[in-house]
């Protein structure tokens, strides 16, 4: 079978073993990582005009966000391969027909590696990514620089100004080594500090690494979309949130001393948000692509 593939965050890796990856015109089916904005949305519309099925593969944590308030986007995909129960529940609540949703799990987490022993306490800061490097990141950097007796690494991506951060480790979500870089950083991590709870934080939770959230985010437009002013970040119960920057260091110290406090919550997030109990997610995704019709 010939498919057109738009890959992002490496979620379509491995499909080349089962399908011929070809151009849009030649493809029998269209496989995308999103259908809500930009060129991908246009491709989904064109595919339907040409009677070609569209299959979406969830590319990151909380794949339901754009279909819920305040965005309320229409789902154009005929099938959506989602990670777990959390995504399905939220998409159904958003009005997406259940027959469009298939829990397949994801290949993202197969990149994770076992943790290794190390000296000292290692904290990884995961700056928030927006359409620019937001000021809240700077506030967290200031706190982390004042912490004594810990080692700081910063996991940055393409939106970040790498010069601002201590011991930056860079990866780009459009490059084939992105998840490998993330996994390698987490091998020696004792704690992750972040502003939002995304895919990287879920990778940490699967490895039973505590996550502290500096709950400082101020709503703002993103890429000119003012609906983001009404957008609120979602959090699982697997994180320790602190809204006051003056208390952040104290919470970090507390979690370093009590790393098992939220162990069960992290396990729940791994199951419900990540679908890690699902065996062979790639094979499930392949089956969805093969069987989807329009």
Regions found by a protein language model. Give the residues of each.
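Donor nucleotide-activated moiety binding/catalytic core segment of transferases
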Residues: 20, 157-207
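Anion (oxyanion) recognition and catalysis
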Residues: 48-49, 145-148, 205
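Catalytic binding pocket for nucleotide-activated donors in carbohydrate/polymer assembly enzymes
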Residues: 76-77, 95-98, 103, 199-273
């Amino acid at each position: 079978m010939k498919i057109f593939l738009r890959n992002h965050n490496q979620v379509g890796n491995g499909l080349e073993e089962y399908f011929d990856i070809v151009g849009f015109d030649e493809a029998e089916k269209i496989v995308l990582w999103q259908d809500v904005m930009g060129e991908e949305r246009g491709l989904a519309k064109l595919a339907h005009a040409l009677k070609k099925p569209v299959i979406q593969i969830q590319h990151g944590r909380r794949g339901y966000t754009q279909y819920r308030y305040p965005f309320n986007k229409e789902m154009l995909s005929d099938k959506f391969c989602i990670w777990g129960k959390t995504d399905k529940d939220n998409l159904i609540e958003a009005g997406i027909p259940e027959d469009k949703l298939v829990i397949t799990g994801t290949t993202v987490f197969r990149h994770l590696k076992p943790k290794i022993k190390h000296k000292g306490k290692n904290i990884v800061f995961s700056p928030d990514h927006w359409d620019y490097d937001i000021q809240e990141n700077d506030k967290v950097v200031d706190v982390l620089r004042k912490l004594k007796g810990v080692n700081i690494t910063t996991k940055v991506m393409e939106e970040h100004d790498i010069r601002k951060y201590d011991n930056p480790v860079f990866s780009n979500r459009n490059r084939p080594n992105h998840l490998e870089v993330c996994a390698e950083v987490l091998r020696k991590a004792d704690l992750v500090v972040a502003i939002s709870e995304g895919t990287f934080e879920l990778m940490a939770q699967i490895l039973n690494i505590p996550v502290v959230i500096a709950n400082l985010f101020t709503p703002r437009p993103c890429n000119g979309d003012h609906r983001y002013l009404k957008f609120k970040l979602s959090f699982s119960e697997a994180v320790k949130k602190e809204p006051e920057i003056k208390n952040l260091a104290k919470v970090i110290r507390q979690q370093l001393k009590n790393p098992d406090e939220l162990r069960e919550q992290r396990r729940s997030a791994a199951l419900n948000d990540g679908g890690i109990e699902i065996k062979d997610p790639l094979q499930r995704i392949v089956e969805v692509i093969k069987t989807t019709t329009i």
